[in-house]
Swiss-Prot record:
GO terms for cellular component: nucleus. This is B3 domain-containing transcription factor NGA1. Its main location: nucleus. Residues 16-26 have a biased composition (Basic and acidic residues). Keywords: DNA-binding, Nucleus, Transcription, Transcription regulation. Residues 35-141 bind DNA. Regulates lateral organ growth. Functionally redundant with NGA2, NGA3 and NGA4. It comes from Arabidopsis thaliana (Mouse-ear cress). GO terms for biological process: flower development; leaf development; regulation of leaf morphogenesis.
Length: 310
């Protein structure tokens, strides 16, 4: 007799399991998805409230005049079967529908962050009046890496420096120290500064340059405006032979005493570019013969003078 009772209980339990599974499957199938809400920083912040979009609030959680002041208590279940109770009300100050009490506890338990998605569902009862509310959540979707933003694709052009053949300084000095390589920095005047030059690398001619070549920035000498041209003209100098004497004068010209003596003798001396730095100009005399050397030695003068009576 005892054996028959035990067998009967086992058969009843086995029949009850499929029935419970069918009811659970039917319950899941009868769930109606209401809406999703992407939580904002304020929804998971210190305000401790969740703003429900107006169109969804008025459709699924309507409030009458009696419950508008105090609000409603809504009971939800998550996927694990845990119950959550939220106070749902309307705020006249912000004219928004919000869930306040109990929401902060849900945020802490699920560790919600801004961008996460909260989903609301319901299961309508057989009578059509009573319904069970469900709440679920999921992390914000990860943005896939777009091929357009791959490394090197955002910067289609890289820059490198031009060769010395295209520099501003090369056309002035190429006949003196053109080596086909770098610059001869020892022969660069002080008036030359340093600048930066870049040129675009055409990807059509060299597709690998856009990815492989790094961006290189170095300084190259460039000629400053105005002063360098005057200095080059001044240092080149001008030569004049006057009364058997070879004279070389710089840019700034001669002194006043020399100009007076040369003008009284009927001669004129050419002037340089005018207005250059007087400290860098120079005046040199070179005698043309040994007799002229003796002539100046006998006079015992260290400065230049001209005797028109000779």
């Amino acid at each position: 007799m005892m054996t028959d009772l035990s067998l009967t209980r086992d058969e009843d339990e086995e029949e009850a399991k499929p029935l419970a599974e069918e009811e659970g499957a039917r319950e899941v199938a009868d769930r109606e998805h209401m809406f999703d809400k992407v939580v904002t920083p304020s929804d998971v912040g210190k305000l401790n409230r969740l703003v429900i979009p107006k169109q969804h609030a008025e459709r699924f959680f309507p409030l009458d005049s009696s419950s508008n002041e105090k609000g409603l208590l809504l009971n939800f279940e998550d996927l694990t079967g845990k119950s959550w109770r939220f106070r749902y009300s309307y705020w006249n100050s912000s004219q928004s529908y919000v869930m306040t009490k109990g929401w902060s506890r849900f945020v802490k338990d699920k560790k919600l962050d801004a961008g996460d998605i909260v989903s609301f569902q319901r299961c309508v009862g057989d009578s059509g009046r009573d319904s069970r509310l469900f709440i679920d959540w999921r992390r914000r979707p990860k943005v896939p890496d777009h091929p357009h933003f791959a490394a090197g694709a955002m910067f289609p052009r890289f820059y490198s420096f031009p060769s010395t053949n295209y520099s501003l300084y090369n056309h002035q000095q190429q006949r003196h120290h053109h080596s086909g390589g770098g610059y001869n920095y020892h022969q660069i005047p002080r008036e030359f500064g340093y600048g930066y030059f870049v040129r675009s690398v055409d990807q059509r001619n060299n597709p690998a340059a856009a990815v492989a070549d790094p961006l290189v920035i170095e300084s190259v000498p460039v000629m400053m405006h105005g002063r360098a041209n005057q200095e080059l003209v001044g240092t080149a100098g001008k030569r004049l032979r006057l009364f058997g004497v070879d004279m070389e004068c710089g840019e700034s010209g001669m002194t006043n005493s020399t100009e007076e003596e040369s003008s009284s003798s009927g001669g004129s001396l050419p002037r340089g570019g005018g207005g250059g730095a007087s400290s860098s100009s120079f005046f040199q005399l070179r005698l043309g013969s040994s007799s002229e050397d003796d002539h100046f030695t006998k006079k015992g003068k260290s400065s230049l003078s001209f005797d028109l009576d000779q």
